[in-house]
From Swiss-Prot:
Keyword Nucleotide-binding: yes
Domain of life: Bacteria
PROSITE patterns: HSP90
Signal peptide: none
Protein name as it appears in the record: Chaperone protein HtpG
Organism: Aggregatibacter actinomycetemcomitans
């Protein structure tokens, strides 16, 4: 009998997610059972952990398991566990809301493309709600460990606008999820269908999955029912690598991550010696939708001596590897370990160092063995990996080898050029790795700063991700060669510079008075005015000194709401350009001023992508064209 019954409305995001999920995941509907068994496994893990400090929570029932049964007459399928259970407050929190930041933004990003919806929902992790793919009503009966029998809770919903919650009496600890199957989903009331799903998705979890099966005499006569263990229930990571198939590794990844897609690669290692631990690391094939959300949880599952301790133990991976999934099972940490203890622990630091190295080696091997697959990884996680040089000085060279860039070597915006590729193609006498940063690939590819490099056939890296400028403030060299921006006023090409130095010097002298006129006109608005011979088709550019903040870095500061120091540019004029020659000959000061201003505005527009006063620029063009 139930008491204290109330009907509550779903959080709006739950309603939207339920509708999307029912339609988008229908083609792979059997995953609901995998999700419910995974939740039951998590509940058992949490009870084991709490019972370390309070063994009485077991209350004489320490053999944890998942039980599956069905009733053909009633059309119900039940998934039960004797794990941690839930209180009334926890039921409302966990089953009536989605406690994830950015949920609204995630749902807004979903379109009408079912394949895309399915992929994104899979990344989100649907868990319990997947029951509504096959059920038109779901009933949950639960009782939290340590609570008396009269503290059971009933939750029930048809997956529409609301749900009912009430107090009930429940004799046993744990949770029963009862699915009232739709008329066209009765295939899941079949013992062999269920055996197949359990074998496919849940063979690897370290918890027995039992099913109520019919028992027969030798003559084939039914004599009753019995609970039969269906899965192997050996924790997969404790088995020898030679015994585990690729399919088992893939399904275990889906169990761990609640991802629907196969992982890109994995590494399973058992380490003995000064430290004893087993790690199973996965690289996902798709980035989670909230990878760049600051509240996004990441990290490995932590086990100590095969006992689950915590999810999302971020202390074992640096932030730039937050996309890695998997687990670590350590013999060297205490069973009562907490997040606080992990923060300042020598064992943790040693494990973090080893797991970071292992992860980078996985990526290095992938890049070497399968460039196409590595490009798939780079498109999903390249931006995150670019955070590495700033975070991890010890592994900076290893990270640098994994970075990929667009380049003038290819007529493509695809980031597929490594620094090793670049160095192998450097010109004789070239001492630096040259790059340019811009708001977009198109802006970088068409920058006037490239003109001399194109003329001389010198490769330039084209960087257009917002993080690039910040990354390069930490990644200043590779293989002993400095990385140098081609937009700097004091750029020195060394042995690659033009040989016509005498001719250029004479030309510069003939333009001396012109340069002085421009300096007088512009005054303190620019740092310096000078002639340049690194342009071929463009009359003028602006550039910054080595000790100055670059344009892209200034934009990065502004976007982050940080104060931006004033950037004073060097104004460089091309004495070989017909327009500069024409302006140098203008005697009328007003007309001269208009043309110089126009040249400066053009250069600023090419460098920054915008002007402080675009109306004045347009007015000036109209005036000079009229």
């Amino acid at each position: 009998m139930s008491t204290n019954q109330e009907t509550r409305g779903f959080q709006s995001e739950v309603k939207q997610l339920l509708q999307l999920m029912i339609h988008s995941l229908y083609s792979n509907k059997e995953i609901f059972l995998r999700e419910l068994i995974s939740n039951a496994s998590d509940a058992a893990d949490k009870l084991r952990f709490k019972a370390l400090s309070n063994p009485d929570l077991y209350a004489g029932d320490g053999e944890l398991r998942v039980c599956i049964s069905f009733d053909s007459e009633k059309g119900t399928l039940t998934v039960s566990d004797n794990g941690i259970g839930m209180t009334r407050e926890q039921v409302i929190d966990h089953l009536g809301t989605i406690a994830k930041s950015g949920t609204k933004e995630f749902l807004a990003a979903l379109g009408s493309d079912q394949a895309k919806d399915s992929q994104l929902i899979g990344q989100f992790g649907v868990g319990f709600y997947s029951a509504f793919i096959v059920a038109d009503k779901v009933t949950v009966k639960t009782r939290a460990a340590g609570e008396p029998a009269d503290k059971g809770v009933l939750w029930e919903s048809a997956g529409e606008g609301d749900y009912t919650v009430a107090d009930i009496e429940k004799k046993s600890r744990g949770t029963d999820v009862i699915l009232h199957l739709r008329d066209d989903e009765k295939e899941f009331l079949n013992e062999w269908r269920l055996r197949g799903i359990i074998g496919k998705y849940s063979d690897h979890i370290g918890l027995p999955v039992e099913m109520l099966t019919k028992e027969y005499e030798d003559e084939g006569k039914e004599i009753g029912e019995k609970w039969e263990k269906i899965n192997k229930s050996d924790a997969l990571w404790t088995r020898s690598k030679n015994e585990i198939s690729d399919e088992e590794y893939k399904e275990f990844y889906k169990h761990l991550s609640h991802d629907f897609a196969d992982p890109l690669l994995w590494a399973h290692n058992k380490v003995e010696g000064n430290q004893e631990y087993t790690s199973l690391l996965y690289v996902p094939s798709k980035a989670p939708w909230d990878l760049f959300n600051r509240e996004h949880k990441h990290g490995l599952k932590l086990y100590v001596q095969r006992v689950f301790i915590m999810d999302d133990a971020e202390q074992f991976m640096p932030n730039y590897l937050r996309f890695m999934r998997g687990l670590i099972d350590s013999n060297d940490l205490p069973l009562n370990v907490s997040r606080e203890i992990l923060q300042d622990n020598k064992v943790t630091a040693a494990l973090r160092k080893a797991l970071t190295k292992r992860s980078l080696q996985m990526l290095e091997k992938l890049a070497k063995d399968d460039a196409e697959k590595y490009q798939q990884f780079w498109k999903e996680f390249g931006l995150v990996l670019k955070e590495g040089p700033a975070e991890d000085f010890a592994n900076k060279e290893a990270i640098a080898k994994l970075l990929r860039f667009a380049s003038t070597h290819n007529d493509s915006s695809e980031q597929n050029v490594s620094l090793e590729d670049y160095v192998s193609r450097m010109k004789e006498g070239q001492k630096a790795i040259y790059y340019i940063t811009a708001d977009s690939y198109v802006a970088a590819r068409n920058s006037p700063h490239l003109e001399l490099f194109n003329k001389k056939g010198i490769e330039v890296l084209l960087l257009s991700d917002r993080i690039d400028e910040w990354m390069l403030s930490y990644l200043t060299e590779f293989d002993g060669k400095p990385l140098q921006s081609i937009t700097k006023a004091d750029l020195d090409l060394g042995d690659l510079a033009d040989k016509e130095a005498e001719e250029q010097k004479a030309q510069d002298e003939s333009f001396g008075s012109f340069v002085e006129r421009v300096k007088t006109l512009l005054g303190g608005r620019v740092k310096e005015v000078r002639l340049t011979h690194r342009l071929t088709d463009t009359p003028a550019v602006v550039s910054t000194d080595n000790d100055q903040m670059t344009t892209q870095m200034a934009k990065l500061f502004a976007a982050a709401g940080q104060p931006v120091p004033e950037v004073k540019y060097t104004f460089e004029l091309n004495p070989e350009h017909h327009l500069v020659k024409k302006v140098a000959e203008i005697a009328d000061e007003a007309q001269f001023a208009d043309w110089v201003e126009l040249l400066l505005e053009q250069a600023m527009l090419a460098e920054r992508g915008s002007l402080e006063n675009p109306a004045a620029f347009i007015k000036r063009i109209n005036k000079l064209l009229g």
